[in-house]
Structures are given as structure tokens and as C-alpha cells.
Amino acid sequence: MNRAWRWFACFTVVVLAAGMLLTDGAKAAEDKVAFYANITAVEPIMEAFTAATGIKGEYTRISTAKFLSTVFTEFEAGKLMADVIQAPLPVLEMLKDKGVISDYVSPEAAAYPEWANKNGIQLFGIEYVGLIYNKELVKPEDVPKRYQDLADPKWKDKIVMANPASHATTIGWLIGLKEHVFASEEEWRDFLKGLAANNPMLVASFGPTPAPIESGEKQIGISMPKYIVTKAPAPLDWARVENQPLMGTPRAMGISTKAPHPEAAKKFMDYWLSKGAMSLLAAKVGEYVLTPGVFPPIDGMDNAQVIPIRELSDDEIATWGEEFKKIFAIQ
């Protein structure tokens, strides 16, 4: 009997030890979170998250143009390392349709507008686009008062913008002008022809747009006002177009269905959506967020009208990309 009890006691100790090792391993496995995103300059949020939770945030930036193919290729190969994924809403919805995004709804979502949650895809901001310019080179009286002013010949060879044949966000923004700003398609097309005639410098995405404006190589661009914050003290300002909105694609995020660190992923998403993190995102990164009462520290932005533009289908993006390629004579 004593021998049997000794065997039982040894077995119990082994089981408990194994359980402790498994628990410690699980804890170790949740000490980091991988974040794939197209948003830039979010290091302050990553650092604040790590300081608040002890979980290391690993940020991988992927351009919008390569986002869908990169994430889905990794997902299909069983090599997706992302726990949390952030991208423009249309990209997240396509990933959701392919089974990449889970149904997790953060408790922080309750503070957002009802329309900002789409079955596990959480909208938290708008990738707002406008006209930014070099305030040392552009006289106050020359700053555009309407989007239409960008077609004025005085801006010839002085504009920079993302390639309208290939940059999906710019394609969507130009269509947004047609649907929200111009009175007719004819007026909109005249604007496009005038803009193209001004021979804008075309770059791959919004990321490279502020540099030539800052340096004085160009004076104005179709870009993101957030760069006024992230590029400070560069001499950048934004054109306060009269009775016309700033527009952009909704920024969205979700948790991967194959997240290597699912619990850490939930903590990260909860933290990201908190008012504290959104305030930091606005203040340090210049983002326009959907948290009520929180605005980026850009003069006049608290009074700006900022609206989301509709999602374009893949076919629409391809069709309009080809159309803009012709209008802008892109080789």
C-alpha cells in the first residue's frame, strides 16, 4: 500500500510539474504581439502598449499596394506571423472574406459609432487626404480655396501626388471628388485634365509625397495632413478648402484567425482602441480618429469636415486605374 502511494505521489508531482511547464510556456508564448499595418509612424503607440502591458509589440509596415497579396500569401502558406492586422477597410473586408480575420469584438468598440464595427472588423479612423503645401514658398493668397484650384496652370510642375493609375487610395479619393465635390462628371473630368496638364510628380504612395514639398522641389501635393505632425518642424500646412470635405478611406483592424498569440492580440486591440491610445495616435502621429472629441494637433482640424469615402471594388479600382493612366499619360 505504501509503495502504491509512493508511485501515486511521484506521478502527481510529475503531472503538476508538467502542467507548470506548460503554463510557463504558454505565458512565454504570449509575451509579444505581431502587428501588420499600412499605417506609418506608430512607434509611440507600440512603445506605450509595451510599457502598459509588458507585452512586446512588433510592428511590420506593409504598403497598401502590397498588403493584400503579402498577407494572403503568408496565410495560404500557413506562415502568417501577424496577430493583429490593420489596413484600409476594403483590404480588411477582402481578408475577412478569405477567412483571415476573426470575429473578435473589443469591449472598447462600445465607445465608437455603431457603423464602425463590422463583424470583427473595427474602424478606428479615416485615412484623410487633402492638399498640403510648403508655407514658406506658397503665398497665403495663392493657397487653394477649392480642390478645383489645383488645376490652375500656375501649379504646373509644382505638384506631387501618388500614382493615380496604381495607388488604390488615390484612385478612391479621385472618385470621392466626383461623388462628393463636383457638380457634374463633366466638371470633374475637366479638373482631371487640368491636373494632368500641370504635370504632377507621381510617386508610389502617400509616404514619399511630403519630402519634395518639404525640400522645395515641389510646392504642393495631394497628400495626408498627418505629415504636418510627423514631419515637424518641416514648413508644411494644409489648404482649408471652403465648404468642401477632407475625404479618406476608413482605417480598420482585426485579429488574425491564426494569430500565434491570440490573448496578446486581444490585449493589443483593446489597448489600441482605448481613448488614451487614440489620443496618442492623434497627438503623435497626426491621425484623424473616430473617438469622440479627439483631434490631431493641426490648426483648424477640429472644425474640418472629414468624411469616409465609399469602398471601390477590385474591378472599379482596375477600371479607373486604367482610365487615369490614359488621362495622366502614364507610361
Predicted regions and their residues:
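Bacterial N-terminal signal peptides
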Residues: 9-20
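Extracytoplasmic ligand-binding site segments that recognize negatively charged/polar headgroups
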Residues: 32-44, 62-66, 72, 80-217
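Periplasmic-binding protein-like
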Residues: 127, 157-165, 191-196, 202-203, 233-259, 272-294
